[in-house]
Amino acid sequence: MSKLSPALKQLINAAHSRPGPVPAPPRIQAVYQRIQEEATERKLGRPSWLGISTAATMTMNSPESMIALYNSTSASRPENESVQIAEFMREIGLKCIGFNGIPRTINMLNAFRASLPPTIASSLNTTPTRSPSPQNILDTNTRGRALWDAIYRPLETKLIDKLGDAHPDLPVFIINQEYGGLFTDPPGKPGAKVGRVTTSLVAITCLRAQQGVGPQVLSHVFGLRKGWEDGTWKEEPEAGSEEAIRWLVSDEGCTWVLEKVDELVEALGGGAGTLSPAIDEKPKELTTTKTMSLINRVRDLATNDEHTRWMIPLLLVVDAALCGVVIEKIPYTEIDWTTYMQHIALIIKGERDYTKITGSTGPLVYPGAHVWIYKQLFKITDEGRDIQRAQYIFALVYLGTLALVFQCYRKARVPPYVFPLLILSKRLHSIFLLRCFNDCFAVLGLFAALFCYQRDQWHVGSFLFATGLNVKMSLLLPLPAMGVLMIMKLGSREAMTHAMIIFQTTVLFGYPFRKAAFSYFGRAFELSRQFTYKWTVNWRFVSEETFLSKPFALGLLSVHVTLLITFFLTRWIKPSKRTPKQFLKIIMPQAEPRDQDTMALRITPNLHT
């Protein structure tokens, strides 16, 4: 009777009886890294994001992913900090018993310790901290009841009665053993501690990952919010700053938590919670490179933004080769290059009056940054005669701009299928490589500014934007949207500082023309200038008479203003959670609004683009 028959062993270990440990998918570290980056942007501390990732991995039963999470978190950390990380993850795993059960937790924690580097494993705490005794049993039960009441008030007593109807010992076990003995840390406990905020995040994560327990998830979402309301979040300052926790308990923050858990479940289990399949169901295939169907591979390649890590350099190399082919095989188109060089030649001779600086296709109508850039090109290209050298310089400008655009799109989580489209634009290659327009440097300045804004480098970004604006005035077009975002992100007073940076940079680039300042600003920033029909592309379908008419110009201006107002009302001010009238009041307030920090947290990289 001590041995089992082969048939019985086979039945016990059958794949359909219960899914086994989940191998680490190839992209799981990238998912962990993204969650960490997003949490850090929101000023959430390590306990918050590491607690979510650890709890989801424990629930999905993936020991390999657990050690991958540890490795990515502890990389380049000193040994003592790596020990703290391992202790914390182990403590999170222990709390998962209350949601995932004992057997799975045993297997996961054993596998986790066995995979740790020997020096880390040997440094882990080996002394129990939750041993019951006559001296601490009352305190443990009191802690459990206090946590229960804090989470479920004002329904705490009704829930106890309801649980007691199911089984009289059920509320006793849950409150005393789970909430008191497990979910709360004993006083004076050495090593890793898991506070109220992180415990709620663990509960939400485990239950969400299991699926099928929506009411319990809802209860712990409310429990997380009550931790903010009663101030117990302050007992765990490592979880995040005040503004970060305020955001975390908001609708937006809770949505973020649930979405991150869903991403982990999708990555680790193909979207199925591991505790939910029916007994006769075969587990779904893991979304790994080896097992995915061709359709799933294509879908993953098109929508999983982690692929942009390798896609961006590949596309840049391909486009660099394409640029070479375009320059060598397609004739250069002369439109403004010669005129630019004629302008620069006059400036080098000492002319500073914009009304006297003219060339083959017209007068100089661009600001000082344009002059400075093309003065350098004048020197490098033998006074503009070496066109091919200029084309290769513009190819470098194009590739640099494209790299910035890629990074801005990647930061905004644009899906990968969009990226190849960026290198297929015939018009972009024409503008940069075949015509050498100054639009190239203006766009470079714009996307360099967006790159900085997305990374909270606002002062540098405003200088770069001002530089692009002083190449070509077309950069005034995105300025209204940028102003609204700055007010919400930085506050109206700091937004005024950035307006001054843009103004002062404009004055700086105009300094060489200070003796003819009126002609400089009149020509370089002339808003009433009428464009020549010959050079239009987008309005070629209308007649020249219509294009040059005043009603047509006023009509376009009206449409533009209408679109600005529409975007202002329907999209730009959304993060402020204000009506248009209320928003206008914060533009010039006597003091910053109370919710400025919360409003600022809603300005994310995807809004910048």
UniProtKB/Swiss-Prot annotation:
Highest taxon of the lineage: Eukaryota
EC code(s) of this entry: 2.4.1.258
InterPro entries attached to this UniProt entry: AhpD-like, Glycosyltransferase_ALG3
Topology versus the membrane: Multi-pass membrane protein
Gene3D superfamilies: AhpD-like (1.20.1290.10)
Stretches that traverse the bilayer: 389-409, 431-451, 468-488, 550-570
Keywords from the UniProt entry: Endoplasmic reticulum, Glycosyltransferase, Membrane, Transferase, Transmembrane, Transmembrane helix
Protein name: Dol-P-Man:Man(5)GlcNAc(2)-PP-Dol alpha-1,3-mannosyltransferase
Gene name of the encoded protein: ALG3
